[in-house]
């Protein structure tokens, strides 16, 4: 029985990419920065001491990161029995965003430029916002700027509740985000507004519209909920997920995977929010999955809760929790199963600003008869998609080189 389990540690980069200078990200290193802070006692909130990731280390994480940066992350060494194949990958895609990373990993790099709203204030064209408001029957909106998702709730959340005006904001990514209160504005109203925005944004080539639902009564207790929804454009060509589905296989999305691929190539969607629930759902789906199945989970909290918020201790604690549960996955893998762990970009919590960082990502592979040892530097995330295609004997992808022969 052949199955692939993909665990996407959203934003878990392992050192600046070859082209990081073009993005202002030379020196960024999500894993290394977290390990360094832990080793220096600067991440002892909710946890303490050096970063402890014994199971990821067994899969080759520390060695993959060393091959990427040239040095071991503080607290890590080669004093571990590695059971998996490990490497690191550069990105071909032009952006350091979520869709680009995910699509490239599935064999379809984004080689064109996304549209962006680059102005930090008055970010959106009036023509665009006027059309959105007219179609939605709204008399105004708030925001119109680059912002942190939590900071803008503190700043504008009360005014939004008082006026009923949605909050529009963006970031360095190709994204249009809409924040609305679940109760005072209504969740379905938010989703419908996002659908309108998605349609009106087509000429601007924006990658995603994101519904940012929140609850609370004031700045002190406003909190985003698990009812986030991403409205992405479709990948420009067929991903390995599409090819798997077309061949009669199952592709099970856990978390926000289906949204990122605009539901293309997905046969089943499982909703879960938070690291614990996402891991639980992954285990359940792996146990239930039959032959010719892909179970694909995005662990978004690493990015949204800790990377963007520049919370080093929180990121470290989340990594240690994730690591502690990996044996549960190991225990239920079949002899022919392929386990893949990777990331879609970096988001160094020690870095300036709140945006993603252009980094290499880990490529950790276990099972399916793979020999333990180095896979070296991969020239594209697409090597993962090509390897999945090879594993399932699907039609080869246009991009990528398989590490499964």
UniProtKB/Swiss-Prot annotation:
It is an enzyme of class 5 (isomerase). Pathway: Carbohydrate degradation; 2-deoxy-D-ribose 1-phosphate degradation; D-glyceraldehyde 3-phosphate and acetaldehyde from 2-deoxy-alpha-D-ribose 1-phosphate: step 1/2. Coiled coil: none annotated. Keywords: Cytoplasm, Isomerase, Manganese, Metal-binding. Mn(2+) 2 binds at residues 303, 308, 356. The keyword Isomerase applies. CDD domains: PPM. InterPro entries: Alkaline_phosphatase_core_sf, DeoB, Metalloenzyme, Phosphopentomutase_DeoB_cap_sf. Binds 2 manganese ions. GO terms for molecular function: magnesium ion binding; manganese ion binding; phosphopentomutase activity. Isomerase that catalyzes the conversion of deoxy-ribose 1-phosphate (dRib-1-P) and ribose 1-phosphate (Rib-1-P) to deoxy-ribose 5-phosphate (dRib-5-P) and ribose 5-phosphate (Rib-5-P), respectively. This is Phosphopentomutase. It comes from Shewanella woodyi (strain ATCC 51908 / MS32).
């Amino acid at each position: 029985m052949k199955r692939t389990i993909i665990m996407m540690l959203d934003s878990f980069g392992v050192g600046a990419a070859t082209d990081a200078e073009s993005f202002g990200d030379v020196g960024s290193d999500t894993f290394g920065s977290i390990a360094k802070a832990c080793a220096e006692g600067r991440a002892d909130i909710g946890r303490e001491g050096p970063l402890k990731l014994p199971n990821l280390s067994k899969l080759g994480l520390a060695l993959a990161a060393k091959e990427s940066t040239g040095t071991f992350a503080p607290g890590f060494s080669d004093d571990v029995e590695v059971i998996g194949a490990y490497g690191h990958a550069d990105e071909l895609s032009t952006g350091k965003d979520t869709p680009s990373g995910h699509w490239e990993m599935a064999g379809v790099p984004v080689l064109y430029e996304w549209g962006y709203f680059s102005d930090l204030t008055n970010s959106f064209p009036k023509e665009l916002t006027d059309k959105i408001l007219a179609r939605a029957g709204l008399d105004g909106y708030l925001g119109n700027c680059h912002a942190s998702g939590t900071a803008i709730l503190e700043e504008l959340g009360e005014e939004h509740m008082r006026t009923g005006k949605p909050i529009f904001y963006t970031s360095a990514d190709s994204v249009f985000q809409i924040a609305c209160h679940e109760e005072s504005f209504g969740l379905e109203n938010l989703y419908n507004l996002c659908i309108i925005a998605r349609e009106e944004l087509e000429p601007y080539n924006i990658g995603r519209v994101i519904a940012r639902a929140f609850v609370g009564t004031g700045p002190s207790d406003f909190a985003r909920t698990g009812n986030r929804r991403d409205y992405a454009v479709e990948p420009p060509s067929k991903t390995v997920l599409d090819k798997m589905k077309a061949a009669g296989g199952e592709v099970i999305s856990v978390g926000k995977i289906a949204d990122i691929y605009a539901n293309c190539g997905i046969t089943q969607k499982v909703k879960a929010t938070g690291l614990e629930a996402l891991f639980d759902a992954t285990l359940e789906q792996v146990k239930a999955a039959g032959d010719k199945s892909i179970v694909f989970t995005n662990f978004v909290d690493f990015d949204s809760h800790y990377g963007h918020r520049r919370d080093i201790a929180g990121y470290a604690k989340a990594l240690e929790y994730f690591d502690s549960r990996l044996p549960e996955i190991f225990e239920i893998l079949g002899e022919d199963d392929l386990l893949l762990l990777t990331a879609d970009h970096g988001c160094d919590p020690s870095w300036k600003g709140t945006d993603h960082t252009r980094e290499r990502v880990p490529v950790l592979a276990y099972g399916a008869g793979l020999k333990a040892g180095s896979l070296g530097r991969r020239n594209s995330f697409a090597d993962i998609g090509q390897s999945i295609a090879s594993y399932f004997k699907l039609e080869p992808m246009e991009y990528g080189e398989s590490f499964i022969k």
